[in-house]
Amino acid sequence: MKYIAPNWLPGGNLQTIWPAVVSVRALAQTPEAAYQRVRWDTPDHDFIDVDYAYAAPSTPALNQKTPQKRPLLALFHGLEGSSASHYALAFAQVAKQYGWDYAVPHFRGCSGEINRAPRAYHSGDYEEIGWMLGKLQDYHVAEGGGPLLAVGISLGGNALMRWAQEAGETAAHTVAALASVCSPLDLTASGHAIGQGFNRLVYTRMFLNSMKPKAMARLKLNPGLFDPQKLLASRDLYEFDNIFTAPVHGFKNTEDYWLRASAKPHMHRIKLPALALNAINDPFIPARSLPQTSQVSRHVTLWHTAHGGHVGYPQGRFPAHVQAMPEAVTAWLAGQLS
């Protein structure tokens, strides 16, 4: 991806915050923001909400490699994200331009309603990802659709890569190609980075302000799930994960969770076309922690851009747009279809 940041929006933090705060306002007014919601029942008597944006049957494909049967692009959102996140709305626009159907399965607790089960979601949630992809494939094929493609944003991208690693040769039976965008593939490095300095003051506080109330609501439905005083006193993601995310999802502690959930150590196991896009100036992800060519399989393409921030990639004159990244990623995915 060839990306040049606007001169008026320098630095990783501005390139992260501006799209999330300003660009999303314009995107929320677009027709693509009018999703159709479907609720799936899960095997553990819970639910997953999926927001669909269907392409018009007459929409021509932009890429000659796109098959006549409409592909489905599935997006797995980031930490505390949703189908209303700026990147989800931007991908919805691009999918429509390609004549593809589009779906955003929500991780538990992120669709606007607290789930019933004790579990929430986490960065290594590959079993949940696999179940969602299977449901998407079954539904899309039953409707006469074409291949399934997947993109994961930040946390969702790490979980998607972990699914591909665990699925091995069988992954290609479900997904034609996948991409991760600004994903913390080394969770230990990223977890420590987001807990320091400006990151701690701004991003960590923002995440915890959303995650703590959800955890407390889950506690009301599942008494004894965790110590509420300790959770409310948590000051960063390390402490929150140690009290809630790790023990609730079967990990010993934060260190065990971050180590076992990280996709980077297993990227040599990926057996289908996969793209990993990261910005060198991402404030969440230290550049030194990004995977290198020698650490991934021949099926993995690495794009490391100098700028872009964390899932930002603003472009153009004030007030900028955020189509550059979704357009580049979608074009790469389309290029993997035969």
Model segments located where?
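Catalytic nucleophile-loop/oxyanion-hole region of alpha/beta-hydrolase
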Residues: 94, 108-149
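Active-site nucleophile elbow and catalytic-triad environment of alpha/beta-hydrolase enzymes
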Residues: 243-266
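Catalytic active-site module of serine/aspartate enzymes centered on a nucleophile-bearing elbow/loop
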Residues: 306-338
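Short beta-strand/loop motif that positions the catalytic acidic residue
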Residues: 270, 276-278
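Short, surface-exposed "cap/lid" segments of acyl-processing enzymes
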Residues: 55-116, 135
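N-terminal cap/lid segment of alpha/beta-hydrolase-fold proteins
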Residues: 14-65, 314-316, 320
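Conserved loop-alpha-helix segment in the C-terminal half of the alpha/beta-hydrolase fold
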Residues: 280-301
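Alpha/beta-hydrolase-fold enzymes
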Residues: 138-140, 149-248
